[in-house]
């Protein structure tokens, strides 16, 4: 009973924050500010910190599988929320289709960025020590590099050679997209609670996991910007993530739900009670105005 009371208090506070109009309106601006000024933290952070190593537990377990973690927790929350209200598998699948669309967009960006990197970059092999002693170094004292043709970035890096070219940070893109997606999908929980919707412990626990995951993604984004600054690749990646969110949640999903549009989060969950449904959609609309 005591733990359940704590769970209720924490989730109510988190739902109030995520459903707040000011938070919804300015959260993407917060991420933009992090992308712009986060690299400046590299002037003060310690490079001997555990977060300065790419092999850190959080990077290996969460960042490399970021989209998977997001789908697991957000998908579970969306399904339980929608199914507990309407008991309609069709409605639940319609709301889950937003994750499928975002996942397809993420995979498409990965393929496109891979093609861009391979088309604009080149692979270089450092000359051996003996050959460097014979040929010398370049004018700046840097070791000579031998250009290797017809090499992709993946095979080049795997062979221990150097890859130089134009890049867009996939990590920044993924983290920004996941943060904005989490904020959108969980924001409906506040209006849902205000309307007296069923909120048992399993649903609140899933919501709490989503909030913790959102906090973790923001923290990892800050760590990447502070300990591994890569300007402007991270800025470009974050911009793509924000543009993807705006195109989906501020554009396409605002259309009326149909076979070609899954609709906004929370729409149709309480349509069996027309007055409550109208109130929920009105509150959701007001909080999504940018």
UniProtKB/Swiss-Prot annotation:
Keywords on record: Endoplasmic reticulum, Membrane, Transmembrane, Transmembrane helix
Cell compartment(s), UniProt: Endoplasmic reticulum membrane
GO molecular function: coenzyme A diphosphatase activity; diacylglycerol binding; triglyceride binding
Topology relative to the membrane: Multi-pass membrane protein
Keyword Nucleus: no
Protein family: Belongs to the FIT family. FIT1 subfamily.
HAMAP family: FITM1 (MF_03229), FITM2 (MF_03230)
Name of the protein this chain belongs to: Fat storage-inducing transmembrane protein 1
Organism: Danio rerio (Zebrafish)
Underlying gene: fitm1l
């Amino acid at each position: 009973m005591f733990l359940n009371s704590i769970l209720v208090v924490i989730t109510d506070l988190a739902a109030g924050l995520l459903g707040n109009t000011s938070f919804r309106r300015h959260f993407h601006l917060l991420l933009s500010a992090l992308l712009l000024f986060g690299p400046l933290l590299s002037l003060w952070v310690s490079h001997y910190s555990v977060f300065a190593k790419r092999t850190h537990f959080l990077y290996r377990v969460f960042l490399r599988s970021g989209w998977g973690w997001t789908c697991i927790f957000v998908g579970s929350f969306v399904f339980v929320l929608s199914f507990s209200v309407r008991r309609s598998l069709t409605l639940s699948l319609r709301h889950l289709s937003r994750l499928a669309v975002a996942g397809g967009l993420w995979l498409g960006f990965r393929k496109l960025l891979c093609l861009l990197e391979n088309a604009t970059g080149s692979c270089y092999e450092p000359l051996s020590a003996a050959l460097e002693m014979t040929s010398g170094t370049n004018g700046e004292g840097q070791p000579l590099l031998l250009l290797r043709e017809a090499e992709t970035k993946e095979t080049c890096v795997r062979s221990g050679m150097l890859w130089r070219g134009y890049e867009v940070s996939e990590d920044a893109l993924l983290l920004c997209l996941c943060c904005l997606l989490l904020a959108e999908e969980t924001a409906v929980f506040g209006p849902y609670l205000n309307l007296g919707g069923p909120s048992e412990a399993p649903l609140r626990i899933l919501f709490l996991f989503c909030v913790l995951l959102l906090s973790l993604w923001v923290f990892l984004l800050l760590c990447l910007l502070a300990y591994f600054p890569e300007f402007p690749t991270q800025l470009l990646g974050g911009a793509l993530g924000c543009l993807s969110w705006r195109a989906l949640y501020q554009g396409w999903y605002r259309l009326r739900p149909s076979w070609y549009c899954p609709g906004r989060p929370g729409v149709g969950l309480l349509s069996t009670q027309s007055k409550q449904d109208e109130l929920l959609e009105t509150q959701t609309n007001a909080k999504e105005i940018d």
